[in-house]
UniProtKB/Swiss-Prot annotation:
Protein name: Large ribosomal subunit protein uL4
Binding partners and assembly: Part of the 50S ribosomal subunit.
Region (Disordered): 58-78
Signal sequence, start to end: none
Molecular-function annotations in GO: rRNA binding; structural constituent of ribosome
Keywords associated with the record: Ribonucleoprotein, Ribosomal protein, RNA-binding, rRNA-binding
Pfam families: Ribosomal_L4
GO (cellular component) term, any one: ribonucleoprotein complex
One of the GO biological process terms: translation
Gene name tied to this protein: rplD
Ranges annotated as biased composition (Basic residues): 63-77
Organism this protein belongs to: Aster yellows witches'-broom phytoplasma (strain AYWB)
UniProt record similarity statement: Belongs to the universal ribosomal protein uL4 family.
């Protein structure tokens, strides 16, 4: 069973915790990770792209000239895709890109992502995060004491206003609650920072 050091905000060792093998020490399923990350990234797409077909472009109801006798090519509408200002053929239309993923697959992907971070020694566990102020400077000093200087995901169980304000101006920090942390977010960081409560939450929900 994997053990992890629990640190305080000053970077000092407070205690050790034995992580649940069924959550933090499974063999990562690469195919499941691939499928779930693709589904989560697809769900982020707005899908609001749109073009107008010849039926949607204004005008063009009248035949521009008679069928025969002019010497010119026959046309029925000035909004044909052949014309400048005409409709678009087979252009994109608004659609929903989301893909359904079964709950068991999502759970397995989350376990795989957490286990992968543990195996890569990219997991940091804090006993708690309590900020006296909402200043980014104070929060950044705490991160420096913990040697967190690269792209990181910080997962807490309760989002406080002070923590949200202090972290929002740091481009390399993503703050998320344990109930909303996604597989894509966990994999897309150099360091995963969990509070002890967040670890307990994952072990309880994913057991």
């Amino acid at each position: 069973m994997p053990k992890i050091n629990i640190l305080n905000q000053q970077g000092d060792l407070v205690s050790e915790k034995v992580l649940a093998t069924t959550v933090f020490d499974i063999k990562p399923n690469q195919q499941v990770l691939y499928d779930v990350v693709n589904a989560q990234r697809a769900a982020m797409r707005q899908g609001t792209h749109a073009t107008k077909t010849r039926a949607l472009v204004a005008g063009g109801g009248k035949k521009p000239w008679r069928q025969k006798g002019t010497g010119r090519a026959r046309h029925g509408s000035i909004r044909s895709p052949l014309w400048r200002g005409g409709g678009v053929t087979f252009g994109p239309s608004p659609r929903n890109y989301s893909v359904k993923v079964n709950q068991k697959v999502r759970i397995l992907a989350l376990k795989s992502a957490l286990s992968l971070q543990v195996q890569n020694n990219q997991l940091v566990v804090l006993d708690n995060i309590n900020l006296a102020t909402h200043k980014t400077k104070d929060f950044q000093q705490m991160l420096q004491k913990l040697n967190i200087t690269s792209k990181s995901l910080i997962v807490v169980t309760q989002m406080t206003e002070q923590l949200a304000l202090a972290s929002r101006n740091l481009s390399y920090i993503t703050l998320e609650t344990a109930s909303h942390a996604s597989v894509y977010q966990i994999l897309n960081c150099k360091q995963l920072v969990l509070t002890a409560d967040a670890v307990n939450y994952f072990e309880e929900v994913l057991k």
